[in-house]
Regions:
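Extracellular glycan-modifying ectodomains
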Residues: 2-537
Length: 537
C-alpha cells in the first residue's frame, strides 16, 4: 500500500511537470497552435494600411503615371542645381512636387473624402467645407463668412484711396469706371453653411464699403444677388452646389446689374444683346470643389446654358476662359471695354462680349492700364471676388501718375510745414514698366505707419504726384538688406508701409540719388510732411 502511494505520488508529480511544460510552450511567441480571432480585425486593418501606403511606390515601380485631373497647375519637379548654383530650396520644392504628383493621388483623395463624408459627415479636404444638403463651400472664404481678420479701418482707408485714384485717373481721360466685388458663395447662401460656423455680429464687407469707400465707382452686387437668391430659392439657384463660383444664371444676373449701371454713362449700350430668358439645362458641370474632393471622378451638377441674341469672336486663339489675356470683337456695339477680372468673370465673357465692339479681359496682376492704348476704351470694370479683396492692397496698378492740379489740395499742402529727415525710407524698386518708370519705397518702421495718402513733391520741378500706398513684397535680396541695415525681422517685412509710383520717362529723369524730395503723408485725416533725399536709388 505504501509503495502504491509512492508510485501514485511520483506519477502525479510527472503529470504536473508535463502540464507546466506544455503551459510554458504555449506561452512562447510563435508557438501557439491557433491565431486568436480577436486580433484578426487589427491584422486586417494594419495590412490594409500598409497596402494603401505602398500603392504609390508599387505604382511607380510598374511605371504607372498619375494624370492631373485637378483644376490647377501642379508643382514641377525641382532641380538640384539652378543657374549653376545649388538649389537651397530643393527639399521644400521636392516635398511640394511629390505631394502633388504621387501615383494614385486622385483615387486616394477621393477615398479619404468618402470615408470622412460617410462616417463623420465632414469634408475630406481642409480646403472644402461640407455644408447642408450636399452643398460645398471653399474653406478660404471662412474668414469672410465668420467676419474674422477683416480689413482694418486703415486698410479700408487705403483701399478707398486706391479706388479713388483709378477713378479720377480714368475720368480725366473720359473713361467710365466700375469697381465691383463678386460675393463669396456663403455670402449669398449662408443658410447652407454648417450650424457650427457662427458669424460675428459686426458689419459685413458690403456695409464696410458703403461706409468708407469715397468713390462712387463701387457697384454693390451682394445685395441684389442675395435678393435674387431669396426670391428664387430652390426653383433656380444662382451659385453651383459643388463649385465656389456662380453658375450661368448668377453670372447673367450680375451682367444685367453691371450693364444697367454702365448704361447711365453709355446710353447707346445694346443691353438687348445679353442672353434671353430661354436656357437649356445640362448635367455636365464639374465644380472646382468637387474636383478637390474626387479628382478621378468628380460629381457633376446642372449648368444653365443660355442662348444669345448676338455673336462675337475672339481676336486670338483662346485655350480657356482662364487665359491671362482675352480679346473679343463684335459688330453689334459701339463702345469698347477693358475688364480687370478673376475667375468669376469666366462666365461673364460670353455675356458681355456681344454688347461691346471691342473687349479686353485681363487676369494679370498688377492691373496694367497701358492696355487702354490697345483700343479707344470707354469703360473699365474692375471685378474681384470677395475672398481676394486684400490683393488690391498688395499690387499697385500700372498707370503713369498725373501731376496734381487740384488747386484746393495744392493750397492745403502748401500750408503744411515740413522738417528735414534722413534715412526714413529706402527704394526697393527702380525699373521700367509699361507705364514708363516704376519707383517703390519702404518707410522705416516708426515713420508713417498709418499712412492713408502719400504725395511726392520734386522741389526742382515744383511738380506733385500722388502715389499708391502700396509696396509689393520685397525680393530675397532686398529682404536681406532690410534685415541687415535696419534690423527688421523677416516676420515683419510684409507689414511694412511705403508707396509705389509710376512716372513718365521724362519725369523719372530727375529721380536721382540724393535728389531732394518732399513727402506729404495723410494720417488720421491730418497731413504731415518731411523733406528728405532719395537713397538706395
Amino acid at each position: 500500500m505504501r509503495q502504491y502511494k509512492q508510485e501514485k505520488s511520483v506519477h502525479s508529480e510527472e503529470n504536473t511537470n508535463i502540464e507546466n511544460s506544455r503551459s510554458r510552450i504555449n506561452t512562447q511567441p510563435g508557438l501557439q497552435r491557433h491565431f486568436p480571432l480577436r486580433k484578426l480585425p487589427a491584422l486586417i486593418y494594419s495590412s490594409l494600411f500598409f497596402l494603401i501606403c505602398s500603392l504609390p511606390l508599387l505604382g511607380a515601380a510598374v511605371g504607372i503615371k498619375s494624370e492631373n485631373l485637378e483644376k490647377r497647375t501642379l508643382a514641377a519637379k525641382p532641380d538640384l542645381i539652378t543657374e549653376n548654383k545649388p538649389n537651397w530650396q530643393y527639399t521644400e520644392q521636392f516635398d511640394s512636387w511629390y505631394t502633388d504628383n504621387f501615383i494614385f493621388r486622385p483615387q486616394l483623395i477621393a477615398g479619404w473624402h468618402n470615408l470622412n463624408q460617410n462616417l463623420f459627415n465632414v469634408s475630406g479636404s481642409e480646403r472644402v467645407v461640407a455644408g447642408k444638403n450636399n452643398w460645398l463651400f471653399f474653406a478660404d472664404t471662412l474668414d469672410d463668412y465668420l467676419k474674422q481678420n477683416q480689413l482694418t479701418d486703415l486698410e479700408m482707408a487705403r483701399l478707398s484711396n486706391i479706388i479713388r485714384l483709378q477713378d479720377e485717373w480714368l475720368a480725366r481721360r473720359g473713361i467710365d469706371y466700375i469697381f465691383t466685388i463678386a460675393p463669396n458663395k456663403n455670402s449669398i447662401y449662408p443658410e447652407y453653411m454648417p450650424e457650427n460656423y457662427k458669424p460675428a455680429e459686426v458689419p459685413d464687407i458690403t456695409e464696410l464699403m458703403r461706409q468708407q469707400l469715397e468713390s462712387d465707382a463701387w457697384l454693390d452686387l451682394h445685395t441684389p444677388l442675395r435678393e435674387t437668391a431669396q426670391s428664387r430659392q430652390q426653383a433656380e439657384y444662382i451659385y453651383h452646389f459643388t463649385d465656389s463660383h456662380w453658375n450661368n444664371t448668377g453670372a447673367l444676373t450680375a451682367a444685367q446689374i453691371i450693364l444697367r449701371r454702365a448704361s447711365d454713362k453709355l446710353p447707346e449700350l445694346p443691353i438687348e444683346n445679353l442672353p434671353g430668358s430661354d436656357f437649356e439645362i445640362r448635367q455636365d458641370w464639374q465644380g472646382d470643389l468637387a474636383v478637390m474632393l474626387d479628382p478621378s471622378s468628380p460629381q457633376t451638377e446642372n449648368q444653365y446654358y443660355y442662348g444669345t441674341n448676338s455673336t462675337y469672336r475672339f481676336k486670338r486663339p483662346v485655350r480657356s476662359m482662364e487665359d491671362i489675356l482675352i480679346e473679343t470683337t463684335s459688330n453689334q456695339g459701339e463702345y469698347n471695354l477693358l475688364m480687370f477680372r478673376d475667375s468669376f468673370a469666366n462666365a461673364l465673357i460670353d455675356m458681355l462680349s456681344p454688347v461691346f465692339k471691342e473687349a479686353i479681359y485681363s487676369r494679370a496682376l498688377p492691373h496694367d492700364y497701358s492696355l487702354i492704348e490697345k483700343a479707344d476704351i470707354d469703360l473699365v470694370i474692375l471685378e474681384i471676388v470677395e475672398r481676394n479683396l486684400g490683393l488690391l492692397l498688395e499690387y499697385a496698378p500700372v498707370m503713369t501718375a498725373d501731376t496734381i492740379e487740384d488747386q484746393k489740395l495744392l493750397f492745403e499742402l502748401a500750408a503744411v510745414e515740413y522738417s528735414e529727415a534722413s534715412d526714413i525710407f529706402y527704394f526697393i524698386e527702380n525699373t521700367k514698366s509699361s507705364a514708363g518708370h516704376r519707383v517703390s519705397a519702404i518707410f522705416k518702421p516708426g515713420h508713417f505707419d498709418e499712412s492713408e495718402r502719400i504725395i511726392i513733391e520734386l522741389p526742382s520741378t515744383g511738380q506733385l504726384y500722388e502715389a499708391y500706398p502700396i509696396i509689393e513684397r520685397p525680393d530675397e535680396e532686398t529682404s536681406k538688406m532690410l534685415t541687415g541695415n535696419w534690423g527688421i525681422e523677416n516676420s515683419t517685412i510684409d507689414s511694412l508701409n511705403g508707396f509705389t509710383l509710376d512716372l513718365s520717362e521724362e519725369s523719372a529723369g530727375v529721380w536721382q540719388q540724393n535728389q531732394e524730395i518732399i513727402i506729404y503723408v495723410q494720417q488720421n485725416n491730418h497731413w504731415e510732411a518731411v523733406g528728405t533725399r532719395i537713397q538706395g536709388f
